[in-house]
């Protein structure tokens, strides 16, 4: 592979405080420094590789050597009329060499319409806009597969993604804030389904706190608390039941509900094995519906599940989200409707969850007279805030 030297005499200067903020993962817009940026008749490429011996950008089959600026920031020049599709090759002191895609060369993966609807509190599929989602970006070098992350944290000074893929060191994956929306975003190539992650949030008072993803659709089995990137492969087979439901007059049709707590109905069952035992039992008793006590993720196993920490994630105690879909699918195929108990009244104060999510009251009302439940020791949602209403209604 040919090595191309930079073809300009000077590269743009970067203020040391700017470099420090980005290299420490505490800048609100790391993409404004890292990635590819226009310079003279080409592009300057910058990458953050603090422990590197040498760094180069692979462009059009050639290596463009990057020079070390300071504090782990490397930069080099590429003569190109269009934004180059490139990869970063990093050599370390131990002799290892890694070639990876650069998260900071990618455009935002959340659009202006999404941000507008979120701010107005009327995004009907919020779970598709925020959270973590498998994503692919097409470029000259082919598809770049990874995961897009987006989280609402309007009071944060900076937000980083930490996970197994970066050894729980978020400096490599600082997010950018999307204008005044309070939404932070990044696309991380190479991160796939099953990856565990959390968010590191720099609060107004300068402290870093670690939080779960409020829109995560899969979590670790408690007492572990990490969010998990997930991708559904379930194929629904309940069309017959859905069609019949649309034709039925629910106000005139008979209805009898069997309520159960999944954790104690019969011991040792998961979502899939529950289908085999629950369906014949409910049919024999003549019930038309089953109502599950809260299945959203909650930290305290002996409870009924009424203190929820993961509103968009079914509890992992009984399997994956697709396993729950399998159970619901089987119930529908048997002609049994499904009701899920929902808990919008309050949420717990666990420091790793929704409470003071970005260092300030966010999901809870700021006035403790309206934001705290003195009898239960829990927090009450700020129902007057658009984004919070959207979080609940979309759920």
Region roles according to the model:
Residues 218-221, 235, 239-257, 261-395:
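Substrate-binding/active-site clefts of carbohydrate-active enzymes
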Residues 1-40, 69-153, 178-259, 264-269, ...:
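The feature marks proteins involved in alpha-glucan
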Residues 48-54, 152-159:
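Short proline/glycine-enriched turn/loop motifs at strand-loop junctions of beta-rich domains
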Residues 146-150, 158, 288-289, 335-337:
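Beta-sheet entry/capping signal
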Residues 47, 59, 151, 163, ...:
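Glycine-rich, histidine-containing beta strand-loop boundary motifs that form or position
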Residues 62-71, 171-179:
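Short, surface-exposed loop motifs enriched in S/T, G, D/E and P with embedded aromatic residues
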